[in-house]
Design a protein with these regions (language model features):
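Bacterial N-terminal signal peptides that target proteins for export
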Residues: 1-11
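Bacterial N-terminal signal peptides
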Residues: 9-19
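Ubiquitous "structural anchor" signal
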Residues: 19-20, 355
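Sec/Tat signal peptide C-region and signal peptidase I cleavage site
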Residues: 21-25
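Conserved small-residue
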Residues: 26-346, 351-474
Length: 474
């Protein structure tokens, strides 16, 4: 393999992959500006002859940090509201309500063509277009995970469903993207420090027959250029239904510096503006690092099980509002298309490059037992970069909880690697190659070998972005 042989020949360049490589000297001919240089590609897939509106990557990232006055108003609210341990109340919902309003403002009106938001700018993460699960060209959605039979409701007998998603970054968060990707050929994670005020919002859509899921009545449908099913790479333009909206907020008041929240679509609310049918599932401000006694189960969701011993997530207890859903491990926050043995924070805390650990313990080649010392490494309150947090593994660089940042850099390096060929000028005086090198230190493993939870083997050989799918047990 090219990657391996290059690695062998130029061992030692690994450490300089994170932009420490000196810029190449300009050379006549070779460094002529290719068309569009300075712009990142917008998407990876669009059918021949498609005449509808297409996705544009919002990529004019702010060069300076935004003014503090632009910090969203909901930062003044207490995200816990009047929540007290063992006694759930609804105060936290005001925070979620305001946070939702902020994400919607101007974006709903612009039909989520966020570069046209008339109130404030929002942006996208570059380098999500590459590879078989990369961005499609209608909405910019990437292929994420499989939706298992019974995952969304006991009536959902359809299998082979899939999730597609697209994330949007406010100007605080986008400033960080711009810093990391300032040099388009040398992404530099040393700039990965999201400032207070950063908000990232992600819409998730499913390809399942909506009539099988009561909460997907009166759905919000988007057309996407999507695969026939999760296992397929053959695409066509088809509708998907909104199921979930995820948010990440950089707020100094939480133990880690990040707050996670999610909303689930419930068409039974029959709200006049269908976007308002996104009801809050909950908020997670910590990872409950002491909660380790495993009482996980993935029954097909007939009721939402709120676990009283979880202290750093609050979950919506209004059963009329929130459709029955599974949560994360031991009741930590997770959404309907997330893995029940994980949590928002536990996956996101692994964001680092080189990628040295899996996003969840059960994906490790030699998985730990639920609740043991090694398992609990995924359930700690790691700090964000501004609070002095380091990488999940020694010798890596933290990406400040942002997984798309990691995947973008990984995709970039794959592309660089796969295009093959070496420029003579890339060889320095010592015979070392001065270019970004693949930096996946962990061996490539066959994901089917790690299939400990009855999770389906991944059909795509290169699917780092996939969220593990849940397997509800009927
Ligand atoms: C199993 C791991 C996993 C879990 C659990 C998980 N995520 Fe993510 N998340 C990902 C991956 C992988 C991506 C990047 C893929 C993409 O969006 O294209 C991502 C992307 C995101 C993004 C876009 C910014 C970023 O970091 O890339 C947001 C916002 C987000 N997730 C929020 C949440 C919230 C809120 C929850 C819990 C309700 C959650 N996530 C649970 C794996 C996970």
């Amino acid at each position: 393999m090219l990657r391996r042989s290059l690695m062998a020949r130029i061992a030692g360049c690994l450490a300089i992959a994170l932009a420490a490589c000196p810029a190449r000297a300009a050379e006549p001919g070779r460094d002529a500006e290719p068309a569009g240089k300075g712009r990142f590609p917008d998407f990876g897939f669009l059918p021949q002859g498609y005449a509808g509106r297409i996705f544009k990557l919002s990529q004019d990232y702010p060069a300076a940090p935004p003014d503090r006055a632009a910090i969203p108003r909901f930062f003044g609210l207490d995200f816990r509201g009047d929540w007290v341990e063992g006694y759930l109340r609804t105060g936290w919902k005001s925070y979620m309500q305001e946070l939702r309003r902020y994400c919607f403002e101007g974006n709903v009106e612009a039909d989520w063509r966020v570069e046209e938001n008339g109130v404030r700018r929002w942006y996208h993460m570059p380098w999500q277009h590459y590879g078989p699960i990369g961005r499609e060209g209608i909405r910019g959605m990437t292929k994420e995970a499989e939706v298992k039979k019974y995952q969304l409701a006991s009536t959902q007998t359809f299998s082979g469903g899939q999730t597609y998603a697209v994330a949007y970054y406010n100007e605080f968060a986008a400033y960080t993207i711009g810093k990391v990707w300032k040099d388009h050929e040398h992404p530099d994670l040393r700039g990965a420090e999201f400032p207070r005020g950063s908000v990232i919002c992600k819409l998730l859509f499913v390809d399942v027959p909506t009539e099988q899921v009561p909460s997907l009545v009166d759905p919000i449908l988007w057309q996407g250029y999507i695969c026939d099913n999760f296992a397929s790479n053959n695409r066509s333009v088809r509708p998907l239904a909104l199921i979930q909206m995820d948010v990440m907020v950089r707020d100094d008041r939480t133990p880690t510096g990040w707050l996670f929240g999610t909303y689930q679509y419930n068409g039974m609310m029959k709200r006049p503006n269908r976007w308002d049918n996104l009801v809050p599932v909950g908020v997670q401000w910590g990872n409950d690092e002491d909660n380790r006694r495993d009482h996980y189960h993935t029954r097909c969701p007939e009721r939402t099980e709120i676990v009283a011993t979880i202290r750093e997530s609050v979950i919506n207890e209004d059963r009329d509002e929130l459709p029955a859903t599974h949560l994360g491990w031991n009741g930590r926050l997770n959404g309907p298309v997330d893995n029940p043995r994980s949590s928002c924070m536990s996956c996101h805390a692994t964001a680092q490059y080189p990628i040295k650990s899996e996003m969840a313990p059960f994906f490790e080649r030699n998985p730990p037992s639920p609740g043991d010392e090694r398992w609990m490494r995924w359930f700690k309150n790691y700090k964000c970069t501004s609070k002095g947090g380091g990488p999940f593994d020694e010798g890596s660089h933290p990406a400040d909880f942002c997984i798309q940042l990691v995947q973008g850099i990984d995709n970039f390096h794959r592309w660089w690697d796969e295009r093959g060929g070496i420029f003579a000028s890339e060889y320095g005086a010592q015979g070392t190659l001065e270019r970004p090198q693949p930096t996946r230190d962990r061996p490539e493993t066959d994901r089917s070998e790690r299939n400990d939870l009855g999770l389906q083997p991944k059909p795509l050989s290169d699917a780092p972005r996939d969220r593990p799918a849940t397997k509800p047990r009927p």
